[in-house]
Amino acid sequence: MSVLSDKSIRKLAVEQSMISPFIDKQVRDGKISYGLSSFGYDARVGDEFKIFHNVNSSIVDPKEFSSDNFVTKKSSDYIIIPPNSFALGTTIEVFKIPRDIMCIVVGKSTYARTGIIVNVTPIESEFFGTVTLEFSNTTPLPAKIYANEGVAQFLFLKGDQSPETSYADRKGKYMGQTGVTLPKV
């Protein structure tokens, strides 16, 4: 596997709509950076979030998940994640991953250095949709996540050959997702 450079990412974004909307350069302007980087793409989080809250000391069960465990917040500026808590967001960008590509997502150092961990599971070949982002506030203090700014870097890896079965072939459960998507079994 090889990591795609800015040239390869740009070509796939323009010719195959791999990232839409696609920002062809790093944008800073007093914001947490987003857009094309040397070997990745810094995606932005949108303005809708779901923040965990404790309802009657419920237990989080991924097989029987209740949307009542979240409060939905919409903000064009930022949201606040309570201390030692968790939130979900979604990318502004829609991703259309080619068959011979997979994607690994890592959090931006700006957030990591303030105790905010961004997690996303690998994005498999031929996935299509927005990407749900998981945020953990590991600090004992409330923490801000800025809407419409960079939150995570997407690294695109080209396989040695196309897979026998892609995410689309398997009819992956998160295929075509838009907005913040809760767990599915």
UniProtKB/Swiss-Prot annotation:
Annotated SUPFAM superfamilies: dUTPase-like
Entry keyword annotation includes DNA-binding: no
EC number(s) on file: 3.5.4.13
Pathway(s) of this molecule: Pyrimidine metabolism; dUMP biosynthesis; dUMP from dCTP (dUTP route): step 1/2
UniProt entry tagged with the keyword Nucleotide-binding: yes
Catalysed transformations (reactions): dCTP + H2O + H(+) = dUTP + NH4(+)
Binding residue positions for dCTP: 108-113, 132-134, 153, 167, 177
InterPro entries: dCTP_deaminase, dUTPase-like_sf, dUTPase_trimeric
Location of the active site: 134
GO biological process: dUMP biosynthetic process; dUTP biosynthetic process
GO molecular-function terms, A-Z: dCTP deaminase activity; nucleotide binding
Keywords: Hydrolase, Nucleotide metabolism, Nucleotide-binding
Subunit structure: Homotrimer.
Function: Catalyzes the deamination of dCTP to dUTP.
Protein family membership: Belongs to the dCTP deaminase family.
Name the UniProt record assigns to this protein: dCTP deaminase
